[in-house]
Amino acid sequence: MSNQHTLLISNLLPVGSNISTWWNFGSMLLSCLFLQTTTGFFLAIHYTANINLAFSSVIHITRDVPYGWIMQNTHAISASAFFICIYIHIARGLYYGSYLNKGVWLTGVALLTTLMATAFFGYVLPWGQMSFWAATVITNLLTAIPYLGTSLTTWLWGGFSINDPTLTRFFALHFILPFLIISLSSIHIIMLHNEGSSNPLGTNSDIDKIPFHPYHSYKDLLMFITLMTMLLLTLSFMPNLFNDPENFSKANPLITPQHIKPEWYFLFAYGILRSIPNKLGGALALTMSIIILTTAPFTHTSYTRSMTFRPLAQTLFWTLIATFITITWAATKPIEPPFLLISQTTAILYFSFFIMNPVLGLVENMMMKYN
């Protein structure tokens, strides 16, 4: 098509013809970002960042503001959809070797970190029981940092405990960070288009490319419609599916919930954190659970980019997925046998993937050499 008219070359974005549905989650993430920014703006108009009024203002939004319940529930459910899409997006990157495009991968990890920070600050804003206690537990981890810890925590809290200044600055951060996410997303996309997408085979796509529109744009549209359908079904029939029952009670510093846990999308990191009995060790493991993703491009040893034709690596990858799900499940349970042992085992298995993957790459190289 492009050969027939040279002017079309500059107008069409050439994309590999064999990229599968796993490549559509990037555009779905963009849809989620747009949805979150829009609904977040309308919620911010009616929200009050004050410890005496925050909980009431959320109730006011859902009860009194026209279509406020749609805005509030869409914002909460889209956050979960955002994380489902981003975890699938990362898993695809690990499976198909997309991390070898270093700039794209590293900006992606920066995006994930910023997104997690934004979601954490957002979870505190309704000022419910679980919001308050999750914020207390997580921010308290800063005290584990030698020398600076206590000063940093006091500075973040704006006092000697989580109070009104904390909520005000968390709201300010929750409002400003999405703009950083938008900026990082732009860099992420620019860097991707600098080299181009990989494909399921892990080969160079230059020999077989088709125009992005209409072929891949309609595929993106289909996935967007699927995403919106799932969101609307959840919104209509199960609006509180991802909410914690504790968060329907106003924050009370005098009553501790029986089991403090963050939102489901942080449970894998939280599970790793509490599987280590030492405070500093747990905080380091929590940080490393995200930062370890940055090692992937530098430890790739296999001759082939993708795991499509690497059965040993595939086994390791699906073990990682099972580990991730198990860690998430175990983190919802109290810290007692057998859940503590399950958390510790899965935490070791999670980090083992990033050590074993390069080792398996070398083993597979040797097997190919001698066959």
From Swiss-Prot:
Binding sites annotated in the UniProt record for a ubiquinone: 193
Any one GO BP annotation for this protein: mitochondrial electron transport, ubiquinol to cytochrome c
Topology relative to the membrane: Multi-pass membrane protein
Co-factor(s): heme b
Domain of life of the source: Eukaryota
Binding-site positions, heme b b566: 89, 188
Residues at which heme b b562 binds: 75, 174
InterPro entries listed in its UniProt record: Cyt_b/b6_C, Cyt_b/b6_C_sf, Cyt_b/b6_N, Cytb/b6-like_sf, Cytochrome_b, Cytochrome_b_C_euk/bac, Cytochrome_b_N_euk/bac, Di-haem_cyt_TM
Binding note for cofactor: Binds 2 heme b groups non-covalently.
Residue intervals passing through the bilayer: 25-45, 69-90, 105-125, 170-190, 218-238, 280-300, 312-332, 339-358
Gene Ontology terms: cellular component: mitochondrial inner membrane; respiratory chain complex III
Main location as per UniProt: mitochondrion
Subcellular location(s) per record: Mitochondrion inner membrane
Gene Ontology MF annotations: metal ion binding; ubiquinol-cytochrome-c reductase activity
Keywords: Electron transport, Heme, Iron, Membrane, Metal-binding, Mitochondrion, Mitochondrion inner membrane, Respiratory chain, Transmembrane, Transmembrane helix, Transport, Ubiquinone
UniProt family annotation: Belongs to the cytochrome b family.
Summary of subunit composition and partner proteins: The cytochrome bc1 complex contains 3 respiratory subunits (MT-CYB, CYC1 and UQCRFS1), 2 core proteins (UQCRC1 and UQCRC2) and probably 6 low-molecular weight proteins.
Further facts: Heme 1 (or BL or b562) is low-potential and absorbs at about 562 nm, and heme 2 (or BH or b566) is high-potential and absorbs at about 566 nm.
Function: Component of the ubiquinol-cytochrome c reductase complex (complex III or cytochrome b-c1 complex) that is part of the mitochondrial respiratory chain. The b-c1 complex mediates electron transfer from ubiquinol to cytochrome c. Contributes to the generation of a proton gradient across the mitochondrial membrane that is then used for ATP synthesis.
The protein's name in its UniProt record: Cytochrome b
Organism annotation: Laticauda colubrina
This protein's encoding gene: MT-CYB
